[in-house]
Amino acid sequence: MLDITYIRQNQDDVTAMLRNRLLESEIPRVAELLGLDRQRRELVQQADDMKALRNRVSRDIADMKKSGSGPADELIGKMKSVAENIAASDTSLKNLESAIEEILLTLPNRLHNSVPVGKSAEENVILKEQGGFDYPLDFPLKNHTELGKSLGILDFERGAKVGGAGFPVYTGKGARLERSLINFMLDTHTSGHGYTEIFPPFLVNRESLRGTGQWPKFADQVYTIEEDGLYAIPTAEVPVTNLHRGEMLDAADLPIAYAAYSACFRREAGSYGKDTRGFLRVHQFNKVEMVRFTRPEVSYEALEEIRQHAEAILLALKIPYRVLLLCSGDISANATKCYDIEVWSPAEDKYLEASSCSNFEDYQARRMNIRYRPDGKSRPEFVHTLNGSGLATSRLMVSLLEHNQTPEGKVIVPEVLRPYTGFDIIG
């Protein structure tokens, strides 16, 4: 959530940001917001004046009763009128603050000055392409769904029978390979990169979704358990970032770095017509998430570290990938800057997104009221929050299976995973 003071002082910048994000329809809401803000500040001043008057009248009544200087009926009547006006003012103020918050919750975040202006994914900037791995794929390739079926390690048909399309089943060595990927990534991030492991709830309340920015703007993408007021998490970012909601963090504890595995659930509303084969678009998938809480002045250094930690997984697995800096028209509403990491699918002949690494500055922390004191006596400030996929296994599995296939239709297990799988080949 943006600071109302920032919006008040930088209306032109906020308008330009909305235009660069292709959200021109939201621009009138800024003027509406500032109009409500003016009303709120005027009402606060009026309420303060009335409360000061009430205090003076109360003292006058007390003095008159103490001195016996005369009847206080007139002043008591005035006091009742002032009290009624204060109550009415408080009700109006509460309604104004609710209207202001409703708009603030839907406005997107600022954009970092390094984010390129663009209208679509075609204008994202390719920062890096990592290849150089020796894969002799000079034979007719099977895609991941064909490999999964022929090797008996993936069962999309039975998954669809149980939960519908987009709910895959891993079987036998496929299940072991998936679990090995998760454990390898968690071990790398905790033992190698210094993250503390978290195993979070997979169901959260609405306040948690609101805190990280999925609610209300992306409510249609979330699976809902209405009778219990709970929601299936779209990413571990939601429960893990909310661990410190409403807390004053100790500056000495910053930065805080968490790594968490979770299943992720997404309705993917509006995906009709897109390629939904196999793992290309699913409703449930597994992901290891990196989450950080930092001082504001070091958050962009932390973003680069998160990106490097995600890349380290791919380098260890010897998966070809590229890094994109997202443009203003493609970046998520909550992020100020975002890198996407895409893995190469040789059978599909295209890149697939496997990780997003984002800085949110104080956008989420303000929604969740997560603060710290730079030193013992200073005024509290909001922390900056960041996260990155480290990584999502579904798209990663596509690239891993397709790159490591043999002409005989077998799959060689990457060397770093063999201590986890207990086998070096599937098939």
From Swiss-Prot:
It is found in: Cytoplasm. The keyword Cytoplasm applies. Keywords: Aminoacyl-tRNA synthetase, ATP-binding, Cytoplasm, Ligase, Nucleotide-binding, Protein biosynthesis. It is an enzyme of class 6 (ligase). GO terms for biological process: selenocysteine biosynthetic process; seryl-tRNA aminoacylation. It catalyses: tRNA(Ser) + L-serine + ATP = L-seryl-tRNA(Ser) + AMP + diphosphate + H(+); tRNA(Sec) + L-serine + ATP = L-seryl-tRNA(Sec) + AMP + diphosphate + H(+). Its main location: cytoplasm. Its EC number is 6.1.1.11. PROSITE patterns: AA_TRNA_LIGASE_II. Pathway: Aminoacyl-tRNA biosynthesis; selenocysteinyl-tRNA(Sec) biosynthesis; L-seryl-tRNA(Sec) from L-serine and tRNA(Sec): step 1/1. Disulfide bonds: none annotated. It comes from the Bacteria. GO terms for molecular function: ATP binding; serine-tRNA ligase activity. CDD domains: SerRS_core (cd00770). L-serine binds at T235, A236, E237, E289, S389. Pfam families: Seryl_tRNA_N (PF02403), tRNA-synt_2b (PF00587). Belongs to the class-II aminoacyl-tRNA synthetase family. Type-1 seryl-tRNA synthetase subfamily. Homodimer. The tRNA molecule binds across the dimer. Catalyzes the attachment of serine to tRNA(Ser). Is also able to aminoacylate tRNA(Sec) with serine, to form the misacylated tRNA L-seryl-tRNA(Sec), which will be further converted into selenocysteinyl-tRNA(Sec). Consists of two distinct domains, a catalytic core and a N-terminal extension that is involved in tRNA binding. This is Serine--tRNA ligase. The lineage of its organism: Bacteria, Pseudomonadati, Chlorobiota, Chlorobiia, Chlorobiales.
